[in-house]
Amino acid sequence: MPEGPSIVILREAAGHLAGRKVLDVTGNSTQDIQRLRNRTLRGVHSWGKHFLLAFDGFSVRIHFLLFGSWRINEAKDRPERLGLHFSGGEVLNVYACSVRFIKGALDDAYDWSADVMGTAWNPATARRRLRARPDALVADALLDQDVFAGVGNIIKNEVLHRIRVHPESRIGALPARKLSQLVDEARTYSFDFYEWKQAYVLKKHYQVHTKRVCPRDGTPLSYRKQLGLAQRRAFWCETCQRRYGADTSAVAEPARAPRRP
């Protein structure tokens, strides 16, 4: 699933399409995508994992789910979910994704302060929302898009390793300093992810995600296919990542070579 930094990269790559008129619309979306024909694209935006195309009176929300992808001025050898053919010969194709229409202004639909890579990101708001969920696992809290819009499973695993917190720690048990580190590092790592992704070196910087040994102390990493309410893959080090709060979970599976993401 593309995480927030990847959507920012797409937003920047597609930004020049704003102001262009849609001359033709293709795709197998079940939505009424033909309403986009002869409309002028007013803006290209992102919120977390949502890619947003703004038109007069409404916007198109694209969520890339688990296997979605996109192409600008080229096509894949499979049917597109939505293809927008703009004036000037520009084309935007998106694949294997969810396409939805949003009525009205985007400001009415989105809380921009929750977007970890946005200019309106508010860490104080994130801390307040976390404190309202004292029993939540930190692994689930990081994936809560109402708190950390754009954070996905890779960022989750890497952030928790960076701040030395076990994924099954409870939010309410974290010291204030650790809670602040959790919030701050979610944003910091997202921008690191963005830079590495643009340079095509992201996977080279993984410390624990899909790895077998902790690079900090050499301990075999613990791995679970499904952890927390989110039921997402988790990789962590029992030596350097401290568990805060009561442990109510099962014993982790032994470390082993994980499947490719």
Language-model regions, residue ranges each:
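Structured catalytic/nucleic-acid-binding cores of DNA maintenance enzymes
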Residues: M1-P261
